[in-house]
């Protein structure tokens, strides 16, 4: 990497080229075919003014270089240099670094040889968000692309437009396209990536047809098949769940990885060790127990002042282009589960007085098994407050008895607990999870949208307090009525918890007479100005209603584990971890047994400065608590029919636009404020994050020559460019637990990393912590050995099973038949066939066995089991252990008399201790 042999000897042939010259040429055309940009290439040979097209067209730039023997050329969009003679990307800094490298032979010898393919310093630009796009005035603004209605698909179009205008997600799909890899069908992430690229392309069409994504979502969830109108919130949940499933990656054990890197690192500065933030495996969160299972990066490259720098870090205003033509690489070939996890809760048995409880934040109880909300009682509608358990999140970890929370600024201290109670680890893992290694997953979806809620419930009889941490991806908020508002405001003014049932009782089951009265009242209300009926409902009121304390009494009493009976209780909930983008769903639709209706009440929501500080738990470590509105989805019509549109703020020019299927119209912000919001997307706002990016831009512009360059995760750099709180540097996305590159990632490692100069790396490392520091990439030999050993193990196990099962099938009358649980067998089969990386736990026949009155175990009637031979059972049991052993033994009894000449076949189930 730093070897002088890697230096391009042709850099001296570059003539004097100014930034203004390059910008002027970028507005021109190919001198051979007349095609316009982007991605024109300018020859850098002295006194050569040629500008040619790239591989996207006829590639006249290459033809010119080969004919004229002009070796160096620069991309007029990305300002990256390519040498045809060396067949690699080159950097102007190498001319400055050459004397230093030449005088440091010791360093050159120690440096590792370059990899088999050139690794690129990726141009990701960070510029001032306030800069105008004057250099691209001749181009239409990006992201203003409509979507054709495919037949009652406005619910999908509005949701996609709202997501498309979430910069962290869009920037990921535009700038980190190499990370969008999946072997899972229907590869919805690929369809979404293609759609985002079309919507945000500089030469965008007036509208696109999202056929591929529509077809994919119908394969995932049959509910969306046909042409019936659907709920946009259900579509959002289903889409994001599937994107997470396809993009999820196992979380590497950070502690082991840090130790592995530290053992090889030349920098052991104790100060840096103290500055490191808690790693990602210290997040405190768990799965939601929701029963609802399914539910900008826009590129601008030309105008950066760092046109000749090795590192251009893109900004959230979208001035960096997506890397479709990153370099002219003729040498390199591109060849080569958050599963349905068990619930993991944080429960605590705590004796505390009500007086002490009053001093604590209001936190709530875990939901009942059929509840879709951590803080509300079940309601007969189609809404869910928390995400489905099909999307696990960052798991619960404990170190020395203290639960730690990750924070964005570097900090390593354990979380500050509330004085009246202490969280303790609950033993609620299922039998399978105890026996099988727990695997944790994360994805860009969970990084952006996942938050967590701390729920607390107290028994009013014994004062037992239990806590649960649950992950949410959206908050479904009730819309309080006039009476509810009075109760909420009264509780606020008196500084006491709101009266329980503030928003639940008003929507209780209604009789026919009550229904008619309610229907007439709602019709009259909809025709009467809101000022006539009372105060306007605000989004803060909806949040207060959601987080208000609830009494558990009557039919909703709390089942106390200490009292062993139903008791009256109180439940609270607070936000434990704020998401980068907060999705809020207003519960406008009510679906009762005999009818449905829509709540048309106007809910006032802020465009800027939504503050969630009043709803945070004391343990919350999020430093930024204010949010600005990104987009809002609106529904016009009734509960039975209607139309969806979206209002979104364009990240480039800050203007608001209405997206109505294929029509996009600029609107004033007052139109947005008066809209009847249904789903709202808010983004964390931080001036400090913008200043931090500007500081990194300044450091990159200094172009200080250095002996070392560092590799950083491209995905984390995208977080730095678009997140208000990016968190610690997470190089674990391209490293294994041993500190090397996993063999299966090495062939596309340049898609996973970005090269940073030393001064930029040191600034980011000192500011955010994390890591580990990486300035040498190598394939992990330990992982390679493990992969080979795993493949050998799989081959031996499956070959042995096939051999034993073939012999078993050849037996006409086996003396004994062993039973094995098909659930366990399917897990083992997935492992040996390579569909699952984790081997199954011990054999678990408990699902197919039942105990007789005498204590013996027999096969359960109707059980899901398979029949195997004694030899096969012995072989599998020797590898995995477990049980119980269930054998159906066949024996022929002695004849009882002449009338029974053929004997009697007796079949009994036997159980042996394992």
Curated annotation (Swiss-Prot):
Entry binding sites for Zn(2+) 1: 8, 10, 83, 86
Subunit structure: Interacts with VHL, leading to its ubiquitination and subsequent degradation. Interacts with CCP110. Interacts with DIO2. Interacts with HIF1A. Interacts with ADRB2. Interacts with USP18.
Positions with biased composition (Basic and acidic residues): 259-279, 316-332
Species of provenance: Homo sapiens (Human)
Claim: Repeat is one of the keywords in the record: yes
Reaction equation(s) it catalyzes: Thiol-dependent hydrolysis of ester, thioester, amide, peptide and isopeptide bonds formed by the C-terminal Gly of ubiquitin (a 76-residue protein attached to proteins as an intracellular targeting signal)
Name the UniProt record assigns to this protein: Ubiquitin carboxyl-terminal hydrolase 20
InterPro entries: DUSP-like_sf, Papain-like_cys_pep_sf, Pept_C19_DUSP, Peptidase_C19_UCH, Ub_carboxyl-term_hydrolase, USP_CS, USP_dom, Znf_RING/FYVE/PHD
Active site: 154, 643
Positions annotated to bind Zn(2+) 2: 30, 33, 53, 60
Zinc finger (UBP-type): 6-111
MF annotations from Gene Ontology: cysteine-type deubiquitinase activity; cysteine-type endopeptidase activity; G protein-coupled receptor binding; zinc ion binding
Localization, UniProt: Cytoplasm; Endoplasmic reticulum; Cytoplasm, Perinuclear region; Cytoplasm, Cytoskeleton, Microtubule organizing center, Centrosome
This enzyme's EC code(s): 3.4.19.12
A Pfam family: UCH
Task performed by this protein: Deubiquitinating enzyme that plays a role in many cellular processes including autophagy, cellular antiviral response or membrane protein biogenesis. Attenuates TLR4-mediated NF-kappa-B signaling by cooperating with beta-arrestin-2/ARRB2 and inhibiting TRAF6 autoubiquitination. Promotes cellular antiviral responses by deconjugating 'Lys-33' and 'Lys-48'-linked ubiquitination of STING1 leading to its stabilization. Plays an essential role in autophagy induction by regulating the ULK1 stability through deubiquitination of ULK1.
Modified residues (Phosphothreonine): 258, 377
Post-translational events: Ubiquitinated via a VHL-dependent pathway for proteasomal degradation.
Enzyme class: hydrolase
Domain USP positions: 145-685
Binding site for Zn(2+) 3: 43, 48, 64, 70
Free-text comment on this protein's domains from its UniProt entry: The UBP-type zinc finger binds 3 zinc ions. However, it does not bind ubiquitin, probably because the conserved Arg in position 55 is replaced by a Glu residue.
Presence of keyword Aminoacyl-tRNA synthetase: no
Chain ranges of the DUSP domain: 687-780, 789-892
Annotated region described as Disordered, given as residue ranges: 257-347, 360-415
Family: Belongs to the peptidase C19 family. USP20/USP33 subfamily.
